[in-house]
């Protein structure tokens, strides 16, 4: 796998080998830095080249080669596509006349997101040159790449290009592969709120996306009642025992409302809740890995109104030492031009 031998085994007779967990070790994943100024970013680590070499008892040999991707689709859709004689790659990812991006935000020809949810969209470069047309001015931007390679479209850099060249804050784009229309991308203004948080998560297709939260957050420190944490210690002065304990670990949990979300965003939220890799930003200076859940969450089969959902984000790490955030300038008196300063001139 990736020119390296990972697994070697043998067996007798007819047998099956599930190689999914073995192959997954060769897919490292990659975090894309959205502050890059390139329009598209080359992405690696999200797939692996796999070769299986088989030799039977009769010394007959055969090779099977394929590209493995981390992620998948629902069992229901997998069965349906199999009965149709197709797969998600032929139907979507390698189809230049449709929404070919690795996003679960949308299941049609349009992708809508808020400004606070902008994050590079991953895709396999189509057979023809990619072109992005801004609908207000009609101006186009050509984004060259190599067909079949994996890239991420940097929407922030694309918007900056149109703003710099044409003086327009672009919010609506049409994406073409050559002369073939593929999809439309719309960017909405985020509501003005007192508190805002973001969740970056690994979606079902194996790429990262961002979900914006516009509700007020509250923190609940969770303490484990461990009987072994309390013990008896001997006091030489009184010749008696007294109770003592080791430092107690506390696991924080943040409760927050999502803000009102449309039906399509609620489906997107379901993918977030099932993700195995979720990070919270906006709570501190750095992202924090969390485990999301939703209590008493239900939605209508045919929804006709936005919905506000309460999420519980449990921190992945437990802490027994509480020192606050440590910053380089946090222990010095702030100057006039610091991010935080008093009205008194210093």
Question: What residue spans do the PLM features occupy?
Answer:
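Extracellular/virion structural assembly segments
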Residues: 2-6, 180-346
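Preference for solvent-exposed, low-hydrophobicity sequence contexts
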Residues: 1-192
